[in-house]
């Protein structure tokens, strides 16, 4: 990277760790970029004249007399309509073989939107996945995590959401992905002909881990451009936030900071909140909605990353494998969208809230019946019907490979009610039963 004549050059490094180097410098600011022996770095700590730089590629081969040049700016992204359909690395450079982007250069990582400029979310975000749209409906401007075990197909779910979501733009931020994952997303988007509305920022396992820290800010800067400048409905998909948190822990550890719970930095809550609070519904019509995958270590929901995430976000979505049908579903018991009441029955059909509640209640009755059966108790006729209902409900609605619009989901649910139960057993208002109960049942 070329340096300018007026840029001050430092050549005395006082301390070097695996990811950081320290020196004395003046007139510099937090998050400012620098080059250390030609390697890109970012300023992460200031204590008087003592500053610490995080070197993205690692400090191997850097001597104590290395040339350090501060660039006078934070990481930036060039924003324009040319972003659509492109794949970028953590620095906003194209990695798809296409031309450089032309546009306005914007610093990433700015503040979240002032609350007085926000509008209460009121628009439905449809994904085609019934476990979301039917039971845990999403609203524009919402922030929600996807909790999943590492062996579950969460990237497939993210790709499906990107292709099905009824939004103007999709921004994908991938952190710690394998090259296979990167190629999977690229091929799926290309084959579906959906590249024109998707922007992707990728960090793979072959890239330095600390580069992951830039991915969310890059993705959200692009999202803000489309939401503010074009008044577009933007959905940001981030995967995997556990990889992001691991990178935070690496930097914190190498800066000799005292770790908090599960070896995470004490700033974890603030670092996560800074990302999730970018979700917003603008009065002008544009919006940023965030769905972020957080993988669980051994299914441990009490780990610092999912634990802090739960306090910040507006609900959570859980993936689990249903052993009865052999498919991955969105778990109706552990999932919750805290804003769904803003759109269910208002932006969707009027029977939506009651159908949703009735289906989950019957599914819970089936879980109780299964427990009775496993403990050797006799099953009633109702128990047997709930078990049969639960299997079809999982297969036809909860499975992540099912793609229906909300009206079709409701019709399927009514069909299952009519197949296995009498109207009085589903506990839905008579006026709705009279209108939607399957005829001839």
Task: Tell what function each PLM region has.
Residues 1-86, 91-95:
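N-terminal accessory targeting/assembly segments
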Residues 46, 56, 90, 111, ...:
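Generic beta-structure capping elements
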Residues 9, 17, 30, 83, ...:
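A generic structural signal for well-ordered coil/turn residues at beta-strand boundaries
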Residues 75-79, 94-99, 116-122, 230, ...:
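Active-site phosphate-binding and catalytic loops of NTP-dependent enzymes
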Residues 134-137, 141-441:
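P-loop NTPase catalytic core
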Residues 66-68, 82, 95-142, 155-160, ...:
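P-loop NTPase nucleotide-binding/switch module
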Residues 18, 48, 92, 113, ...:
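Residues that form or immediately flank small-molecule/cofactor binding pockets and catalytic motifs
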Residues 9, 39, 64, 83, ...:
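Residue-level signal for beta-strand positions within conserved beta-sheet cores that form or flank
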